[in-house]
UniProtKB/Swiss-Prot annotation:
The keyword Membrane does not apply. Belongs to the class-I aminoacyl-tRNA synthetase family. TyrS type 1 subfamily. Catalyzes the attachment of tyrosine to tRNA(Tyr) in a two-step reaction: tyrosine is first activated by ATP to form Tyr-AMP and then transferred to the acceptor end of tRNA(Tyr). Residues 355-412 form the S4 RNA-binding domain. Keywords: Aminoacyl-tRNA synthetase, ATP-binding, Cytoplasm, Ligase, Nucleotide-binding, Protein biosynthesis, RNA-binding. InterPro entries: aa-tRNA-synth_I_CS (IPR001412), aa-tRNA-synth_Ic (IPR002305), Rossmann-like_a/b/a_fold (IPR014729), S4_RNA-bd (IPR002942), S4_RNA-bd_sf (IPR036986), SYY-like_C (IPR054608), Tyr-tRNA-ligase (IPR002307), Tyr-tRNA-ligase_bac-type (IPR024088). HAMAP family: Tyr_tRNA_synth_type1. This is Tyrosine--tRNA ligase. It holds the Pfam family tRNA-synt_1b. A motif ('KMSKS' region) lies at residues 230-234. It is found in: Cytoplasm. It comes from Mycobacterium sp. (strain JLS).
Length: 423
């Protein structure tokens, strides 16, 4: 069973760990229980959470038992950031977010009655019952303020606007989670992003001091692209959310299909379960035939199916093909069509608004001016609903609107925009 570490190594998924030999020996001795925690600081998890989530799944597939911990308590405090205090949410809001995130967590690991069946916990169940006196005596007594002040994030905050005691104490709450999971489930390994190393190691020490047990810590790398930009940010700069109401399956798919050649093979290693042989073939295809974007299509398909399911992936792929003239637009359901167009640009068309094709091209941003629009039409570079427009006097008829209110405009091969008729 220790081969899980070899698997993680070749995928580049181990950033730091405590005693590697001891961890390997314990993994080889039999099934291990491990956990990773996820704080409900928003209504949904985002793409940045995928690495630790999928690492839990890899351990489960290797015969170990994962615990997914929803941070109903720690989410009310917030891990210190480099700049600024977090806005404290109400208990009801955090509880609602924790329930939503718990549902998302359950998609990534298998829950059954087997020895490797996953467990879901919420740290509010033990932290909420902890009195101030108990917290200070049973947890705080084991922590040196000098060590806590030496954390990079804390040090940067102290050099700036300072840090509240609330956020300063976050490390203690997370460390106590490890103690509780060790006592309840025999948990012996915590995994998380490399920015959590200090908190995780604090838990390892607290388990040793309070229970006399040796447990382990391992972190995964924080994912950036080849230009050093943070992974999982949408084109608008916001997070790429797992909740389809916050990031549509179409937007999710498009993010991954637009992955740079320099990043796609690494992303396939980190975010999919493809074997080395197939990854090698995709790496070769990217090197020798980059214009085909074979690896990007596989990445987008794998991750959309993982997060949203096979039906959503099929709908998204049909939408992508139809938008770019390789499928039937009328066959798309309206939610999929609307979501796809909103990832491009949508202009509204009112009953009194100008509806000449040149006006629509300018309104959607596909042309800089009516003159430019006329030139593009004359060159045969404009289509509406995948039908080429030959006249700059063209106006839409009622029958042209998909689902009674949508037009799909395209300039050239890849520039797409939408027009939405409003009444």
């Amino acid at each position: 069973m220790s081969s899980i570490l070899d698997e993680l190594d070749w995928r580049g998924l181990i950033a730091q760990s405590t005693d590697r030999d001891a961890l390997a020996a314990e993994l080889a001795a039999g099934p291990m229980t491990l956990y990773s925690g996820f704080d409900p600081t928003a209504p949904s998890l985002h793409a940045g959470h995928l690495v630790p989530l999928l690492t839990l799944r890899r351990f489960q597939q290797a015969g170990h038992r994962p615990i997914v911990l929803a941070g109903g308590a720690t989410g009310m405090i917030g891990d210190p950031r480099d700049t600024g205090e977090r806005t404290l949410q109400t208990a009801d809001t955090v509880a609602d977010w924790a329930d939503r995130i718990r549902g998302q967590l359950e998609r990534f690991v298998e829950f059954d009655e087997s020895p490797t069946g996953a467990i879901v916990e919420n740290n509010l169940s033990w932290t909420g019952a902890l009195s101030t006196i108990e917290f200070l005596r049973d947890v705080g007594k084991y922590f040196s303020v000098n060590v806590m002040l030496d954390r990079d994030t804390v040090r940067r905050r102290l050099e700036g606007e300072g840090i509240s005691y609330t956020e300063f104490s976050y490390m203690l709450l997370q460390a106590n989670d490890y103690v509780q999971l060790r006592k309840r489930h025999g948990c012996a390994l915590q995994i998380g992003g490399s920015d959590q190393w200090g908190n995780i190691v604090a838990g390892v020490r607290l388990v040793r001091q309070k229970l006399g047990d040796t447990v382990h810590a391992m972190t995964t790398p924080l994912v950036t692209d080849s230009e050093g930009k943070k992974f999982g940010k949408s084109t608008g700069g916001g997070n790429l959310w797992l909740d389809p109401e916050m990031t549509t399956p179409y937007a999710w798919y498009q993010y991954f299909i637009n992955t740079a050649d320099a990043d796609v093979v690494n992303y396939l290693r980190w975010f999919t379960f493809l074997e080395a042989g197939e990854l090698g073939e995709l790496e070769e295809a990217t090197r020798d035939r980059p214009h085909q974007r074979t690896a990007q299509r596989r990445l987008a398909r794998e991750l959309t199916t993982l997060v949203h399911g096979e039906d959503a992936t099929r709908s998204v792929e049909h939408a992508s093909q139809a938008l770019f003239g390789r499928g039937e637009l009328a066959a798309l359901d309206e939610p999929t069509l609307a979501a796809a167009l909103r990832e491009a640009s949508v202009a509204e068309l009112t009953p009194s608004g100008p509806d000449l094709i040149t006006d629509l091209l300018v309104a959607t941003g596909l042309s800089a001016s009516k003159g430019a629009a006329r030139r593009t039409i004359a060159e045969g570079g404009v289509s509406v609903n995948n039908v080429k427009i030959d006249s700059d006097e063209w106006t839409p008829q009622a029958s042209d609107f998909l689902h009674g209110r949508w037009l799909v405009l395209r300039r050239g091969k890849r520039n797409i925009a939408g027009v939405q008729r409003v009444r």
